[in-house]
Amino acid sequence: MDLCVTIKGVSFLLQAGLGILANALVLLAYAHIRLAEARLQPVDAILCHLALVDLLLLLTRGVPQTMTVFGMRNLLDDTGCKVVIYTYRIARALSVCITCMLSVFQAVTVAPAAGPLLSGVKARLPQLLAPTFAALWFINMAVCIAAPFFSVAPRNGTVPPFTLNLGFCHVDFHDNLSYVLNGVAVSVRDFAFVGAMLASSGFILLLLHRHRRQVRAVRRSQGSTMETRAARTVLMLVILYSVFFGIDNVIWIYMLTVAQVPPVVADMRVFFSSCYASLSPFLIISSNRKLKARMVCATSEQERQAEDGKNSSGKN
């Protein structure tokens, strides 16, 4: 196997494998917390949903891409391509939407209650989570409904113009107008959510700066400490998303200017567009004491059960 192909395959394999494992661990840890405490905090519920969406994204894009790089062909038929591409498009859209939702939610949470309106919104935030999740799923399922109509299994021969060659599937837009309109629509949606995300994150950053200046004059409570820690986690997630979003869109804008996209360019975009989904769970785990405590607890429990099993076997 060619060295470049090997490096590319190993990169995709590590990205998909570690990302899937980390997102699954986050989901399992939050499931354990939900069973133990009977409820999740609003920020935890959003992070749990983000891990679910990122897991779907890696399963529908990272895994097929890795298998294709290692030479596996004819993975999916037309129906399989339609299902996988549609699910991927929804997961990708939800990833930016939920990250934006997390940033806006945290901005409202840390904002000082300046009046009855904001106080009322703050009080209702936990009740608004479920309807917001449902609305985001419904809207993105409707917006991405055109994706299956352009998705087909790869055909023998050359790739037609205005076609995104994903390796395991082709997304054939047939003409330049459909190709450009799709690209512009996706970019406008993403930039709108990223703009809201950056605006709310800037507001959080301003509040944290003010808090740091006033911290010697104001007694710090446990609640404010937890809010500050959560706000910093949100800021790090937004920065992480913005970096890879920028790289992704630079490549995407280039792809819109050419009728035939070189495979190496398409592979680069796939890799960078999946980096957030694979790295964000590590950031969530490293900055969330509750998650780390649950994982340590689960590991200790497994070790204790294994030790008890060995002792029982020795007695027998």
Swiss-Prot record:
Protein name in the entry: Olfactory receptor class A-like protein 1
The record describes its membrane topology as: Multi-pass membrane protein
Q: Which PANTHER family match?
A: VOMERONASAL TYPE-1 RECEPTOR
Q: In which tissues is it expressed?
A: Highly expressed in the olfactory rosette where it localizes to a subset of olfactory sensory neurons, mainly in the apical region of the neuroepithelium. Not detected in other tissues tested.
Instruction: Tell me the GO molecular function terms.
Output: L-tyrosine binding; monocarboxylic acid binding; pheromone binding; pheromone receptor activity
Which residues are the signal sequence here?
none
Q: What is its main location?
A: membrane
> Hey, which family's this protein in?
Belongs to the G-protein coupled receptor 1 family.
Record's GO cellular component, any one? plasma membrane
Using the chain's own numbering, where are the disulfide bonds? C81-C169
Please tell me whether the keyword Cytoplasm is annotated for this protein: no
Q: Which InterPro entries match?
A: GPCR_Rhodpsn_7TM, Vmron_rcpt_1
Organism annotation? Danio rerio (Zebrafish)
Q: Where are the Cytoplasmic topological domains?
A: 30-39, 119-132, 209-233, 286-316
Q: Any ranges marked Extracellular in the topology annotation, and which?
A: 1-8, 61-97, 154-187, 255-264
Q: Name one GO biological process term.
A: response to pheromone
**Positions annotated with a glycan in the UniProt record:** N156, N176
- Gene that specifies this protein: ora1
Q: What does this protein do?
A: Probable pheromone receptor. Shows high specificity for 4-hydroxyphenylacetic acid. Activation of the receptor stimulates intracellular calcium release.
From the record, give the transmembrane residue ranges: 9-29, 40-60, 98-118, 133-153, 188-208, 234-254, 265-285
The record's keywords, sorted A to Z, are: Cell membrane, Disulfide bond, G-protein coupled receptor, Glycoprotein, Membrane, Olfaction, Pheromone response, Pheromone-binding, Receptor, Sensory transduction, Transducer, Transmembrane, Transmembrane helix
Q: Where in the cell is it found?
A: Cell membrane
